[in-house]
Protein backbone atom coordinates (compact mmCIF):
# COMPACT_ATOMS: atom_id res chain seq x y z
CA UNK A 1 0.00 0.00 0.00
CA UNK A 2 1.40 3.39 -0.97
CA UNK A 3 2.09 5.91 1.74
CA UNK A 4 -0.72 8.42 2.23
CA UNK A 5 0.01 11.79 0.66
CA UNK A 6 1.16 14.30 3.24
CA UNK A 7 -1.21 17.25 3.66
CA UNK A 8 0.13 20.62 2.57
CA UNK A 9 1.01 23.12 5.27
CA UNK A 10 0.98 26.90 5.04
CA UNK A 11 2.81 29.35 7.27
CA UNK A 12 0.42 31.88 8.75
CA UNK A 13 1.26 35.19 10.41
CA UNK A 14 -2.18 36.03 11.82
CA UNK A 15 -5.94 35.65 11.39
CA UNK A 16 -8.75 38.21 11.40
CA UNK A 17 -12.32 37.05 11.99
CA UNK A 18 -14.28 40.09 10.82
CA UNK A 19 -12.37 41.85 8.06
CA UNK A 20 -14.32 44.67 6.42
CA UNK A 21 -11.74 46.19 4.06
CA UNK A 22 -10.19 43.10 2.45
CA UNK A 23 -12.75 42.28 -0.21
CA UNK A 24 -16.53 42.31 -0.56
CA UNK A 25 -18.67 41.90 2.53
CA UNK A 26 -17.39 40.51 5.80
CA UNK A 27 -14.21 38.46 5.34
CA UNK A 28 -12.24 35.91 7.30
CA UNK A 29 -8.73 37.17 6.54
CA UNK A 30 -5.70 34.92 6.56
CA UNK A 31 -2.36 36.76 6.65
CA UNK A 32 0.43 34.50 5.45
CA UNK A 33 4.13 34.82 6.24
CA UNK A 34 6.83 35.47 3.68
CA UNK A 35 7.39 38.36 1.27
CA UNK A 36 10.19 39.22 -1.17
CA UNK A 37 9.29 42.90 -1.42
CA UNK A 38 10.63 45.47 1.02
CA UNK A 39 8.09 48.26 0.77
CA UNK A 40 9.27 51.35 2.62
CA UNK A 41 5.76 51.88 4.01
CA UNK A 42 5.18 48.26 5.08
CA UNK A 43 3.26 48.14 8.35
CA UNK A 44 3.88 44.42 8.83
CA UNK A 45 7.64 43.85 8.36
CA UNK A 46 7.25 40.95 10.76
CA UNK A 47 5.57 39.05 7.89
CA UNK A 48 8.67 39.10 5.67
CA UNK A 49 10.21 35.92 7.07
CA UNK A 50 8.15 32.84 6.28
CA UNK A 51 9.83 30.84 9.04
CA UNK A 52 8.20 32.88 11.80
CA UNK A 53 4.71 31.82 10.74
CA UNK A 54 2.50 29.27 12.47
CA UNK A 55 1.92 26.12 10.37
CA UNK A 56 -1.68 25.30 9.42
CA UNK A 57 -3.31 22.87 7.02
CA UNK A 58 -6.09 24.03 4.71
CA UNK A 59 -8.65 22.01 6.66
CA UNK A 60 -7.55 23.59 9.94
CA UNK A 61 -7.98 27.09 8.55
CA UNK A 62 -11.35 26.37 6.95
CA UNK A 63 -12.60 24.85 10.18
CA UNK A 64 -11.79 28.15 11.89
CA UNK A 65 -13.23 30.25 9.07
CA UNK A 66 -16.63 28.56 8.72
CA UNK A 67 -17.45 29.37 12.33
CA UNK A 68 -18.11 32.89 11.06
CA UNK A 69 -19.94 31.92 7.85
CA UNK A 70 -23.24 33.14 9.27
CA UNK A 71 -21.88 36.70 9.20
CA UNK A 72 -20.75 36.63 5.58
CA UNK A 73 -24.11 36.95 3.86
CA UNK A 74 -24.09 36.75 0.06
CA UNK A 75 -20.90 38.78 -0.43
CA UNK A 76 -18.46 37.65 2.25
CA UNK A 77 -15.96 34.82 2.35
CA UNK A 78 -12.24 34.33 2.90
CA UNK A 79 -9.36 36.56 1.86
CA UNK A 80 -5.72 35.53 1.88
CA UNK A 81 -3.31 38.43 2.30
CA UNK A 82 0.18 38.75 3.67
CA UNK A 83 3.02 38.84 3.36
CA UNK A 84 2.74 37.56 -0.20
CA UNK A 85 0.30 34.64 -0.59
CA UNK A 86 1.63 33.56 -3.99
CA UNK A 87 4.93 32.53 -2.39
CA UNK A 88 2.96 29.63 -0.89
CA UNK A 89 1.06 28.91 -4.08
CA UNK A 90 0.59 25.15 -3.68
CA UNK A 91 -0.91 25.58 -0.23
CA UNK A 92 -3.00 28.54 -1.34
CA UNK A 93 -4.44 26.62 -4.29
CA UNK A 94 -5.35 23.73 -1.99
CA UNK A 95 -7.00 26.11 0.48
CA UNK A 96 -9.03 27.87 -2.21
CA UNK A 97 -9.98 24.58 -3.89
CA UNK A 98 -11.40 23.26 -0.63
CA UNK A 99 -13.10 26.58 0.08
CA UNK A 100 -14.81 26.58 -3.32
CA UNK A 101 -16.00 23.00 -2.68
CA UNK A 102 -17.88 24.45 0.30
CA UNK A 103 -19.29 27.34 -1.71
CA UNK A 104 -17.03 29.94 -0.10
CA UNK A 105 -16.07 33.11 -2.01
CA UNK A 106 -12.28 33.40 -2.35
CA UNK A 107 -10.23 36.59 -2.61
CA UNK A 108 -6.49 36.85 -3.21
CA UNK A 109 -4.78 40.02 -1.98
CA UNK A 110 -1.42 40.12 -3.75
CA UNK A 111 1.38 42.43 -4.81
CA UNK A 112 1.66 40.42 -8.03
CA UNK A 113 5.42 40.27 -7.57
CA UNK A 114 5.75 36.47 -8.03
CA UNK A 115 3.79 36.51 -11.32
CA UNK A 116 5.32 35.02 -14.46
CA UNK A 117 4.01 33.61 -17.74
CA UNK A 118 6.81 31.07 -17.98
CA UNK A 119 7.20 27.39 -17.12
CA UNK A 120 5.74 25.40 -14.28
CA UNK A 121 5.21 28.52 -12.20
CA UNK A 122 2.73 29.86 -14.75
CA UNK A 123 0.79 26.60 -14.72
CA UNK A 124 0.52 26.83 -10.95
CA UNK A 125 -0.71 30.41 -11.20
CA UNK A 126 -3.36 29.37 -13.72
CA UNK A 127 -4.57 26.63 -11.38
CA UNK A 128 -4.73 29.07 -8.48
CA UNK A 129 -6.74 31.61 -10.46
CA UNK A 130 -9.30 28.97 -11.44
CA UNK A 131 -10.32 28.72 -7.77
CA UNK A 132 -9.97 32.46 -7.08
CA UNK A 133 -13.11 34.58 -7.36
CA UNK A 134 -11.49 37.99 -6.94
CA UNK A 135 -7.95 39.36 -7.08
CA UNK A 136 -7.05 42.46 -5.12
CA UNK A 137 -3.88 43.71 -6.82
CA UNK A 138 -1.73 46.21 -4.96
CA UNK A 139 0.09 48.44 -7.45
CA UNK A 140 2.68 50.29 -5.39
CA UNK A 141 4.00 52.60 -8.13
CA UNK A 142 3.42 52.96 -11.87
CA UNK A 143 6.99 54.09 -12.59
CA UNK A 144 9.40 51.16 -12.63
CA UNK A 145 12.45 53.03 -11.32
CA UNK A 146 10.44 54.64 -8.53
CA UNK A 147 8.89 51.25 -7.79
CA UNK A 148 12.35 49.78 -7.30
CA UNK A 149 13.22 52.56 -4.86
CA UNK A 150 9.95 52.17 -2.97
CA UNK A 151 9.84 48.36 -2.82
CA UNK A 152 13.21 46.97 -3.88
CA UNK A 153 11.58 45.20 -6.83
CA UNK A 154 10.54 45.91 -10.43
CA UNK A 155 6.88 46.46 -11.27
CA UNK A 156 7.03 44.76 -14.67
CA UNK A 157 5.64 41.41 -13.57
CA UNK A 158 3.04 43.19 -11.42
CA UNK A 159 1.68 45.17 -14.35
CA UNK A 160 1.84 42.04 -16.49
CA UNK A 161 -0.28 40.21 -13.93
CA UNK A 162 -2.88 42.96 -14.24
CA UNK A 163 -2.85 42.52 -18.01
CA UNK A 164 -3.16 38.76 -17.71
CA UNK A 165 -6.10 39.03 -15.31
CA UNK A 166 -7.72 41.33 -17.86
CA UNK A 167 -7.09 38.80 -20.64
CA UNK A 168 -8.84 36.01 -18.75
CA UNK A 169 -11.61 38.24 -17.43
CA UNK A 170 -10.80 37.68 -13.77
CA UNK A 171 -12.55 40.24 -11.52
CA UNK A 172 -9.99 42.58 -9.99
CA UNK A 173 -9.77 45.42 -7.49
CA UNK A 174 -6.75 47.69 -7.66
CA UNK A 175 -5.35 49.32 -4.54
CA UNK A 176 -2.69 52.01 -4.37
CA UNK A 177 -0.90 53.25 -1.26
CA UNK A 178 -0.55 57.02 -1.40
CA UNK A 179 2.85 57.98 0.01
CA UNK A 180 3.89 61.65 0.15
CA UNK A 181 7.17 62.38 -1.66
CA UNK A 182 7.05 58.88 -3.19
CA UNK A 183 3.86 58.03 -5.07
CA UNK A 184 1.55 61.03 -4.74
CA UNK A 185 2.75 63.16 -7.66
CA UNK A 186 0.00 64.00 -10.14
CA UNK A 187 2.17 62.72 -12.98
CA UNK A 188 2.40 59.26 -11.42
CA UNK A 189 -1.28 59.14 -10.52
CA UNK A 190 -2.29 60.16 -14.05
CA UNK A 191 -0.09 57.44 -15.54
CA UNK A 192 -1.51 54.87 -13.15
CA UNK A 193 -5.04 55.92 -14.05
CA UNK A 194 -4.27 55.55 -17.76
CA UNK A 195 -3.01 52.02 -17.13
CA UNK A 196 -6.09 51.13 -15.11
CA UNK A 197 -8.35 52.59 -17.81
CA UNK A 198 -6.74 50.22 -20.34
CA UNK A 199 -8.07 47.23 -18.37
CA UNK A 200 -11.64 45.94 -18.65
CA UNK A 201 -11.93 43.73 -15.57
CA UNK A 202 -11.38 46.31 -12.83
CA UNK A 203 -14.39 46.44 -10.54
CA UNK A 204 -13.04 48.87 -7.98
CA UNK A 205 -10.10 51.22 -7.37
CA UNK A 206 -9.03 52.23 -3.87
CA UNK A 207 -6.53 54.73 -2.51
CA UNK A 208 -4.94 53.65 0.76
CA UNK A 209 -3.39 56.65 2.55
CA UNK A 210 0.06 55.98 3.98
CA UNK A 211 0.18 55.79 7.77
CA UNK A 212 2.89 55.29 10.38
CA UNK A 213 1.12 52.72 12.57
CA UNK A 214 3.68 50.03 11.76
CA UNK A 215 6.81 52.16 12.20
CA UNK A 216 7.42 50.78 15.69
CA UNK A 217 7.67 47.25 14.29
CA UNK A 218 10.65 48.23 12.15
CA UNK A 219 12.45 49.50 15.23
CA UNK A 220 11.54 46.42 17.27
CA UNK A 221 13.05 44.26 14.52
CA UNK A 222 16.20 46.38 14.45
CA UNK A 223 15.48 47.98 11.06
CA UNK A 224 15.85 51.65 10.19
CA UNK A 225 12.45 53.04 9.20
CA UNK A 226 12.97 54.48 5.67
CA UNK A 227 10.08 56.97 5.79
CA UNK A 228 11.06 58.60 9.07
CA UNK A 229 9.83 62.19 9.07
CA UNK A 230 7.28 61.71 6.29
CA UNK A 231 3.76 62.46 7.48
CA UNK A 232 0.58 60.80 6.19
CA UNK A 233 -1.01 62.57 3.20
CA UNK A 234 -3.35 65.48 3.85
CA UNK A 235 -7.07 65.18 3.15
CA UNK A 236 -6.54 67.48 0.18
CA UNK A 237 -3.94 65.14 -1.37
CA UNK A 238 -6.11 62.10 -0.68
CA UNK A 239 -9.06 63.79 -2.39
CA UNK A 240 -6.82 64.71 -5.32
CA UNK A 241 -5.64 61.10 -5.70
CA UNK A 242 -9.20 59.81 -5.54
CA UNK A 243 -10.18 62.19 -8.32
CA UNK A 244 -7.22 61.41 -10.56
CA UNK A 245 -7.63 57.65 -10.11
CA UNK A 246 -11.42 57.74 -10.47
CA UNK A 247 -11.72 55.61 -7.35
CA UNK A 248 -14.76 53.69 -6.24
CA UNK A 249 -16.90 50.96 -7.74
CA UNK A 250 -16.83 50.62 -11.52
CA UNK A 251 -19.56 49.17 -13.71
List each model region and its residues.
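Short glycine-rich or small-residue beta-strand-to-loop segments that form or flank ligand, phosphate
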Residues: 79-81
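Short cysteine/histidine-rich metal-coordination sites, predominantly Zn2+-binding motifs
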Residues: 53-63
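Conserved AdoMet/S-adenosylmethionine-binding subsite of the radical SAM
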Residues: 66-70, 74-77, 86-213, 220
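Pocket-edge positions in alpha/beta enzyme catalytic cores
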Residues: 53, 84, 150, 181, ...
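Auxiliary Fe-S-binding modules of radical SAM enzymes
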Residues: 1-21, 173, 178-251
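Hydrophobic adenine-recognition pocket in adenosine-nucleotide-binding enzymes
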Residues: 35, 85
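Short glycine-enriched, charge-decorated loop/helix-capping segments at active-site entrances
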Residues: 46-50, 148-154, 222-230
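N-terminal [4Fe-4S]-dependent radical SAM core
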Residues: 1-31, 37-54, 67-74
Amino acid sequence: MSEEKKELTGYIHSLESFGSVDGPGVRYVIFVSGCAMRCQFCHNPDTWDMKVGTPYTADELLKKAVRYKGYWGKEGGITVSGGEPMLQIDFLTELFRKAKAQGIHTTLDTSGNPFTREGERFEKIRKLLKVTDLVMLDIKHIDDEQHKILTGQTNRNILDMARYLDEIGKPMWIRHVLVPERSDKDEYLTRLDAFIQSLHNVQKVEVLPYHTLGAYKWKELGYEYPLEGIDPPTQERIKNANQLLHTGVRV
